[in-house]
Design a protein with these regions (language model features):
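Domain-level signature for soluble enzymes in the chorismate/prephenate branch of the shikimate pathway
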Residues: 1-380
Length: 380
């Protein structure tokens, strides 16, 4: 058989496959009607396990895994189709619809907002980008910001999530696993670091440089020019600047913003010392309540998947099948569960699309743990 004959044979097989797939989905629709009438869940995990075992027996050894992957995707498509036929009558889509209905049309210009650090922190600058007149309450660390939201001390909290140079803020992702919250908005802030000192300090005098670990990671090349200086991490760039200002010493410096320099009376020995000129940090605005404002086009999710081959593939295949773009995937180890991870997903999708509603109905049933973290828009 030559190439053209082989391709023709494949075309004929594909015609049969599409016909059989259509017939299979028609059967799935009948099953959906039965499940609705008898108040049964769409997902029948036991039935799917039996089917996959049977498929494994039918497939030749060298195609067994491929056959299981194929049918896992078919099962996902079938469930999503059933959810759509049933009107996405699942709890999460209902919760999202209720939040859309109850959320005001405009993001609040004023609110009590929790920020980590002190006056001049980048979190403050991000907060002022999101709110016209925020009442900011400062906390010493990120965990305190999450706690302030959970306890109702503040309506919103501003948290840095990732940087274009240094990557994800791992400490924040780990805290996200421990706290209950929703993301209601995000923004990107251009981060420009200066080497700040007390007036009269010279570059050759510096023996200690203070800053947050993310800022230190963003300025590695510049710090190599200070081989005699000890690099000391602290909770916040603004706290570093405040410490230098109050230290009374002329052998210490801080990596922080020019805003901090002006605020604390410091001199910039060097400006824009970050490795990359386009250095941006993405901040999220969190709330205790689920609020979904008009224009929300990004959704964040957290999942703990079964510790078995193909579990992540099953989720990614569902995104692909529904035409939903994955913007970011992050994994973090789960405490006290060796080599098991929680996965964070950022998706680009309209909250009004049928595909989004199908996804929200489908995902909770295929995860060991599932958390919907919110749908929101990003302020540029």
């Amino acid at each position: 058989m030559n190439l053209e004959q082989s391709r023709k044979a494949i075309d004929e097989i594909d015609q049969q496959l599409v016909k059989l797939f259509t017939e299979r989905m028609a059967c799935a629709a009948e099953i959906a009607a039965y499940k609705k009438e008898n108040n049964l869940p769409v997902l029948d995990a036991g039935r799917e396990r039996q089917k996959l075992a049977a498929i494994s027996e039918m497939a030749p050894d060298d195609l067994e895994n491929s056959a299981r992957c194929l049918y896992s995707l078919i099962f996902s498509l079938s469930r999503a189709y059933q959810h759509r036929l049933l009107g996405n009558d699942a709890e999460l889509p209902k919760k999202i619809a209720a939040a859309i209905e109850s959320t005001p049309s405009l993001f609040p210009p004023k609110a009590m907002v929790a920020c980590q650090g002190v006056e001049g922190a980048y979190s403050q600058l991000a907060c002022e980008k999101l709110f016209q007149a925020p009442n900011i309450l400062y906390f010493s660390n990120f965990e305190a910001v999450f706690s302030a939201i959970e306890k109702g001390l503040c309506q919103y909290g501003i948290i840095p999530l990732e940087n274009s140079t240094a990557g994800s803020v791992n400490k924040v992702y780990d805290l996200m696993l421990q706290h209950e919250f929703y993301i209601v908005r995000s923004t990107r802030l251009k981060v420009d670091h200066s080497l700040l000192v007390r007036p009269g300090t010279k570059l050759e005098d510096i023996r200690e440089v203070y800053s947050h670990e993310q800022a230190i990671g963003q300025c590695q090349e510049f710090l190599k020019t200070l081989p005699n200086a000890q690099i000391i991490r602290c909770e916040n760039t603004a706290q570093a600047a405040k410490f230098v200002a109050e230290s009374g010493r002329n052998d210490v410096a801080a990596l922080a913003s020019r805003t901090c320099g002006a605020l604390y009376g410091l001199t910039a020995l060097a400006e824009s010392v970050q490795d990359q000129g386009n250095n941006y940090t993405r901040f999220i605005c969190i709330s205790k309540n689920l609020e979904i404002y008009p224009g929300a086009d990004r959704t964040s999710l957290r999942m703990v998947l079964a510790h078995k081959p193909g579990a992540l593939y099953q989720v990614l295949s569902l995104f692909n099948a529904l035409g939903i773009n994955l913007n970011k995937l992050e994994s973090r180890p789960i405490p006290e569960r060796d080599f098991e991870f929680a996965f964070y997903f950022d998706l680009d999708t309209s909250i009004y699309s049928p595909a989004f509603l199908q996804l929200m109905a489908e995902l909770p049933g295929i995860c060991e743990q599932f958390s919907y973290l919110g749908s929101y828009s990003e302020v540029i």
